[in-house]
């Protein structure tokens, strides 16, 4: 018996094809995705070229973490375009679009759960933070992304959507707190304060945009009910928070390898008592 003949079971291939077709038919939505595929591809080539002379050690680690950002992004955006990581969900009672089927780009949360830790890893290496702080912040970041996905995909009750949203924001506060306080102090001690401050401001300002877009978009209050407009908002944030951020960081590292290399050996260094 074919799986498509089993009652209640839907062919995943059919759903994927339908989702991909729906994305292609929405010019606003598809253009927001293709732009990022193109920019991510360009970023990969540029970053590989920039890293050709970067020496082993911390500079090379920063380069590796930074290169992963567009690599993850291009994979994710292709997943969205193919319909693999796009689905339809019915909004719960109390939502502005209650009872309506809304297209969810849940693959974005998968992207953020993989790419934002790389951003934080690169920043942590730049600031020469201790391993415990780096682990805590990256764990909080992943928690932020996972609970954000839960907020977007929960359909049982509107209260649960906003509860997950609040938890995600709480994780976000942990990340922001580290960037503004402890990590800034570490960067000052490491001699990388100037570039770290620039990247920190860029990261904090842009990352604050994501929960705002969620809140006003179709997933939240639905003040903006166009999935295409919401997708463009996320895509623009991604361009600056990922590719522009990464280019600024790599250009500085390539020109200041000695500073990065001698800034400290906190990460990966074992205690002399071991």
From Swiss-Prot:
GO molecular function, one term: photoreceptor activity
SUPFAM superfamilies in the cross-refs: Family A G protein-coupled receptor-like (SSF81321)
Amino-acid positions noted as binding chloride 1 in the UniProt annotation, renumbered to this chain: 105
Keywords: Cell membrane, Chloride, Chromophore, Ion transport, Membrane, Photoreceptor protein, Receptor, Retinal protein, Sensory transduction, Transmembrane, Transmembrane helix, Transport
Modified residues (N6-(retinylidene)lysine): 242
Ranges in the topological domain labelled Cytoplasmic: 52-57, 128-130, 181-192, 256-274
Binding site for chloride 2: 111, 115
Job of this protein: Light-driven chloride pump.
Protein name according to UniProt: Halorhodopsin
Species the sequence originates in: Halobacterium salinarum (strain ATCC 29341 / DSM 671 / R1)
